[in-house]
């Protein structure tokens, strides 16, 4: 039988997803299983790798059952996943922590502050092309070293979420450069682990898995897992990449000069460039096809529309209805202007910025209010584009994705 299907896995923050995709990129079957995000205390965010694996098995079984002869038709497996979640495993491949810190875990703020006080930011920026931040795995390891030294002592390898799933599938340990580019441990020029940054942060270099290209075959599907799923042992499992770099690839943002606007809860603006842009105003992520994504994240985004829907309609109207109401106001919303900083703003000079309406008049109605909210987010994106550092050209094409791309008015 022809092997004409590909099994895709996404280790998301909200859940585990699997899909069967044909050679033309059509999704023939899809399955999703939610998993818990654990918040032991304010600022912490954890998940159990065991839950990811359970979700992987369950969703793979589900999609295989939806397509005729699917197990015999699968040609290869590839995973992507949430970035920065730091899984330490021991010699036997067991996580040394039952629950691991995720990308949105803020417990590492003291470690970042201590590092900056000790080493500054200039040298790390020059090597990694990124500023120190609580999300980066380097500082998660620093926190574990200080607070859970026994877990670090038992560990032999650091993996990211999709890498741990890959390990369970193949028994092979590896990371990929897209994940490593946002670890604060990789030299952006050589695209290899940096001994200097490991020493500066206090990360044991021996923990860092070999870096493999996303399109490389990591290994074959383990016989035990294959038997459990009804798949062929030895099926090629690719290295894969982080979820956001994969999303850029999937949306066709693949060459220097292109841009991406992913507006969901927040807005992530990414411009592709041949080289990283070493500037404290931006972050840099390597894409699966080897181009650098110069990115900035705006706290303002779909969350502003969500707030307006709740505040003005008590969530009784759909997002489509809210957008339709906004179409009844003229461009400029009758002189009404909205600053969308409902939870502060990362790129503003003052991070305690707050949202405000300017220009309210007696005749201002819901249409103007909703249009002003949409336009306020767009103006924030434009501000980022207008203040790009020297050396960064304006994009010749921007591809919009996520929830914001569903609104014709917003686009």
Residue ranges of each PLM-predicted region?
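A generic structural motif
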Residues: 34, 102-103, 284, 299
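Short beta-strand-loop/turn "lid" adjacent to the catalytic site in phosphate-handling enzymes
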Residues: 65-103, 128-137, 166-187, 210-213, ...
